[in-house]
Amino acid sequence: MRIAIFHNYMDNIGGAELVDLILAKELNADIYTTNISRKKIEKMGFKTDNIFSIGKIPVNAPAKQEAAYWKFKNLNLGKKYDFYIIAGDWAMSGAVHNKPNLWYVYSPIRELYDLNKYIRENIVPSVYLKNLNKYIFDVWVFYRKFLNKLDLKHVQKIVCISENVKGRVKKYLGRDSEIIYP
């Protein structure tokens, strides 16, 4: 069985990226992503000949997230694979053209849901006109939630990494899911 794993970016390697690398190794799967740090991945003992970039994207937010979203939204691998595992929040739009699929959820997009107020108040800068950036952020969040829920309709099965994430998926996205601990 040919399996592809989608992940937002593989240039900063953390827990989610490590899980994806292990999944790819154990399932003999390919990884599709945007930015890749092959040196970091090889230093961790993983091969990189099965990791493919669908295009470089900016390194700073929110341009990084937006670019990753649209790269995956337009990705159509046709019948090249028998199954697709989507293992990134901004890569979830890859479900639109790639089926059958499963979304392995590390978390719904936190800046849209559970951390929205914190980010708005503590991270979004208040420069130029008072609170203008906060209003722009609010419009962006509204638009992103709309697209996120549209794309979610193309996800066929949801598996979460924890009971906590399962609760967030139910609360914010209204979908049931299973749990497979990494």
Q: What residue spans do the PLM features occupy?
A:
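N-terminal subdomain of nucleotide-sugar transferases
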Residues: 1-44, 79
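Active-site regions of enzymes building and remodeling cell-envelope glycoconjugates
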Residues: 29-30, 43-55, 96-107, 175-178
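Membrane-proximal helix-turn-helix segments that form the acceptor-binding/catalytic region
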Residues: 120-158, 166
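Active-site donor-binding segments of glycosyltransferases and PAPS-dependent sulfotransferases
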Residues: 30-92
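Helix-loop-beta element that forms the nucleotide-linked donor phosphate-binding surface
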Residues: 160-161, 166-182
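Active-site proximal beta-strand in glycosyltransferases
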Residues: 83-85, 96-129, 159, 178
